[in-house]
Amino acid sequence: MAHCLHPEKFFPVVKSVALPPGSLNGKVALVTGGGTGLGKAIATTFAHLGASVAIAARRLDVLEKTADEIRSSTGGVCEPFQMDVKDPAKVAKAFDAVEKKLGHTPDILINNAAGNFIMATERLSPNAYGTIIDIVLKGTLHVTTELGRRCIQQKRGASVLSITTLYAQSGAPFVVPSAVSKAGVENMTKSLASEWAKHGLRFNAIAPGPIPTEGAFGRLFAGELKDSGDAMKASVPVGRLGHPEEIANLAAFMSSDFMSWMNGAIIDFDGGQQHIHHGSHMGQFLHEWDNEKWEETENLIRGRTGKEKKSKL
């Protein structure tokens, strides 16, 4: 057994907002992909903390419903803005609208717009992988550079936080377009951290492990969402999956002035999933050994060590 059987005892889920009230007062925060899932959770937390939140995506009807929910639950400011990250002209138009409605260029950008699906790579058409690259990599670049140009021209600072994935660093089968794109976003993060800090902009990323949302899990896994999640818990050492509110708290902290010295960081947020076997091909088998097997192995090692000592005398 490689994972904790009692996560509720040792690793409880805390969904309340972590930062003090007012921690983001006076900030304008733009969250792409903000209508659902992780983006919605992040936008909600930001509104709780006093930010004027702009949520952006293609479907205005979804955004309007989410904005109403966030305003109702937080008493804060949340406005919907239609944006297609694949189209630089539409990105610029959305920024114009945000500035007009909320007063100025965003102080915080959350790059959360994404697209993904599981498929054998040899079955992917150029259009299929091109769509993912257009959204995840090129779309993130469109939004980030639009913000950057405006901030540099206006001599404004900003915090840019991109949501990537664990396999951006390791690679993963059957999600090649997403892996390629997210790896590019992480390299953009580190590159701009060194290039644009002189202009007052800082760049970081969160690489989450499995955090169930209807959108992400629905696209990636066959069957019911719950079944997909239950099967994945065994791969996470802490014995449970993440929750959107948890990544929202981390995003708020990293985006806030409390973390103004953090720049160029990629933060893994996965319950230890990537380290479960520590790169050892034996790890998955060793977790299943009982005390008898370990005692047998210890005796073999002691016996071998004793023979080696005698041979040297």
Curated annotation (Swiss-Prot):
Presence of the UniProt keyword Oxidoreductase in the record: yes
Disulfide bridge map: none
Top-rank taxon, per record: Eukaryota
GO cellular component terms listed in the entry, alphabetical order: mitochondrion
Regions that span the bilayer: none
GO molecular function: 2,4-dienoyl-CoA reductase (NADPH) activity
Statement: the UniProt record of this protein carries the keyword Oxidoreductase: yes
Enzyme class: oxidoreductase
Entry's Gene Ontology BP terms: defense response to Gram-negative bacterium; fatty acid beta-oxidation; innate immune response
Enzyme Commission number: 1.-.-.-
Keywords: NADP, Oxidoreductase
Gene3D superfamilies in alphabetical order: NAD(P)-binding Rossmann-like Domain (3.40.50.720)
Entries under InterPro entries matching the protein: NAD(P)-bd_dom_sf, SDR_fam
UniProt: NADP(+) binding residues: 29-61
The family this protein is said to belong to: Belongs to the short-chain dehydrogenases/reductases (SDR) family. 2,4-dienoyl-CoA reductase subfamily.
Protein name per its UniProtKB record: Uncharacterized oxidoreductase F53C11.3
Organism: Caenorhabditis elegans
